[in-house]
Each structure stands twice: as structure tokens, then as C-alpha cells.
């Protein structure tokens, strides 16, 4: 069963996440740094020791859920117990990575998570993206992997992620979601 109606269920290996309860209060954006199919395969490999709740394909916005929202995916180190992780197809350093199909699907998903899990979408980051680690306040509840303490070696989803547009999409400011 999926937690978001548009998603396809394709479970991660049970070795790659925790069944401990997820006390969701934030949503974290990632880039796969590879392909959609390759990331699904990797999360199903028992030796990977990594997962995310959702993966989104760039070409058409297809959403795959791999970990139930009430479980802890392993995507953000010591922040896993309270976050939902969304992986986006492609690479953070690719200026052309953010297709409308993928961004709109991600925004619909995030808006749904916020509504169902009590996360305030208005607390999303709406500033610039970064090509280095950039810590933002804990009060920002929808943000990038490279904006979380303990993840200083990360910068995804990168400087090209359309944060201002995304903020508008998840807060009712036009677009498809």
C-alpha cells in the first residue's frame, strides 16, 4: 500500500530502513546523483544501508514509494526519525535537471505530506539554492539535504533547485499541484 495515491509501491530492502516510528515534522529534498532506475535498484540492495521514502523520475514525474511514511528511511543521518525523504532523478550540479514534470510531481507529493502529517508548508525554504553545504534554521521544515546539521558533506538538491517556485507550488501559488 502507498501513502500517496499517485505513487507506485516498490519496496526498499528491509535492511535499508528502520521500522521505528517516524515522528514526521519535516520533508527533505535530495538528488539521486544517478538515475531513477539505478536508485530503485540500489535501495533494494540489502548492503546499501540507505533509502528514501519516495523517488521521482525526471522524464514524466512518476513517483515510486519505497519506504512507508511511518517508518524511518535512511537518508539524512541523525534526522531520519522525524523526516520524509524525497529523492529526485538526476544530479544537483546539472542546471537542466529540474523538469516541470518532476518539480510539479514533487510539489504535489510534498503538499500532500504536509497536509497528512501536520507539517507547515509555509515553513518551507524559499531562498536560493546552494552548491555547498548551507545550514538553515530548524524552523525551516521543507528543505534540502545539504541544509541539515551533520550533513556537511552534502549540498543536494543543489543551487539549481527552484526553491521560490516550489514554495509557491506547495503553498497554493498557481501551477499544477
Swiss-Prot record:
Keywords: Antibiotic, Antimicrobial, Cell wall biogenesis/degradation, Disulfide bond, Hydrolase, Secreted. GO terms for molecular function: N-acetylmuramoyl-L-alanine amidase activity. InterPro entries: Amidase/PGRP_sf, Amidase_domain, NAMLAA_amidase_2. GO terms for cellular component: extracellular region. Its EC number is 3.5.1.28. CDD domains: PGRP (cd06583). The keyword Transport does not apply. Optimum pH is 8.5. Residues 23-158 form the N-acetylmuramoyl-L-alanine amidase domain. It is found in: Secreted. Disulfide bonds join 114-121. One of its GO terms (biological process) is peptidoglycan turnover. It catalyses: Hydrolyzes the link between N-acetylmuramoyl residues and L-amino acid residues in certain cell-wall glycopeptides. Its main location: secreted. Antibacterial activity against Gram-positive bacteria M.luteus, S.aureus, E.faecalis and P.acidilactici and Gram-negative bacterium E.coli. PANTHER family: N-ACETYLMURAMOYL-L-ALANINE AMIDASE AMID (PTHR30417:SF1). This is N-acetylmuramoyl-L-alanine amidase A. It comes from Achromobacter lyticus.
